[in-house]
């Protein structure tokens, strides 16, 4: 079958089965075209509970599918490709978190959504890159242990100088490879371009940005801006998607190595096979995980909404 034929079959089967397809913005264009909703982690979290359907196929990584299941326990949820995991979500385990909590006993524990559901059971609230500042500001506690991404944590801390932060030494393996030198090279090559960056990048990179925001924030800024050229400091799929949606503008990756292969493992055939009952992985979580992670995730939606 051609790509177009596979897409048509997916559209037909998802309608027949009352299935909603959610796709993270880092997925390929051919996947976004069959999705009912595309966006960043926060948008996917909200849509998971809002969508009126009997089942959800998540085209993203494991923690996203788990978050979807926690927010929609009555729905069947599948991860389109079972091997799609997030390295950052796996950097800190429960034992490591408990050791950190012992070091900072009077700190509120704020988890980036890029964490396992098990880890979320022992956190006060989780956040996304688009909601982190707002949620941390609303917390009653003045001391915050931010896990696992110190880059996003430092960005939030700069916005909230009235609060004290402690961090874990984690981070996104892709975003942290971007250096200030990469930015300098990109600006030299494209002197008229604005630099838009994700806060998962290192401080030295974020400090040079014309705009700092989540994946959705970056895309919305670029679409609405009167400017015509942009250097994009996040996963390189966003360059592709923005160029597709804004053909009158020019978009350049800040670094060629900013490609998340974990997101790229999901294919159209994964979705097709999942709908056929021949692929994907249905998500099941123990009751204690559903309840503990649910408390953390629902508080995120409550404070960030």
For the regions a language model picked out, list residue spans one by one.
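Active-site loop-to-helix "anion-binding N-cap" substructures in soluble metabolic enzymes
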Residues: 1-232, 238-305
């Amino acid at each position: 079958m051609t790509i177009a034929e596979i897409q048509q079959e997916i559209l037909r089967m998802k309608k027949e089965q009352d299935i909603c397809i959610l796709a993270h913005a880092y997925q390929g264009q051919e996947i976004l075209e069959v999705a009912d909703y595309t966006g960043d982690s926060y948008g996917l979290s909200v849509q998971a509970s809002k969508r009126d359907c009997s089942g959800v196929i998540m085209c993203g990584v494991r923690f996203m599918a788990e978050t979807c299941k926690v927010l929609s326990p009555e729905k069947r949820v599948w991860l389109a490709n079972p091997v799609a995991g997030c390295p950052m979500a796996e950097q800190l385990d429960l034992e490591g978190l408990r050791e950190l909590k012992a070091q900072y006993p009077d700190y509120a524990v704020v988890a980036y959504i890029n964490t396992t559901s098990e880890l979320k059971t022992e956190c006060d609230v989780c956040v996304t890159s688009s909601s982190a500042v707002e949620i941390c500001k609303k917390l009653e506690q003045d001391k915050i242990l931010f896990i696992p991404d110190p880059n996003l944590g430092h960005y939030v801390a700069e916005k909230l100088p009235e609060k004290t932060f402690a961090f874990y030494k984690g981070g996104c393996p892709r975003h942290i490879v971007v250096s200030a030198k990469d930015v300098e090279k990109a600006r030299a090559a494209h002197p008229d371009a604005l630099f838009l960056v994700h806060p998962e990048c290192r401080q030295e990179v974020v400090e040079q940005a014309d705009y700092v925001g989540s994946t959705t924030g970056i895309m919305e800024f670029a679409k609405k801006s009167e400017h015509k050229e942009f250097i994009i400091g996040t996963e390189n799929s966003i360059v592709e998607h923005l160029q597709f949606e804004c053909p009158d503008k020019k978009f350049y990756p800040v670094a060629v190595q900013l490609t998340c292969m974990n997101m790229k493992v999901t294919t159209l055939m994964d979705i097709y096979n999942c709908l056929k009952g021949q692929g994907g992985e249905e998500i099941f979580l123990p009751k204690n995980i559903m309840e503990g992670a649910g408390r953390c995730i629902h508080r995120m939606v409550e404070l960030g909404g």
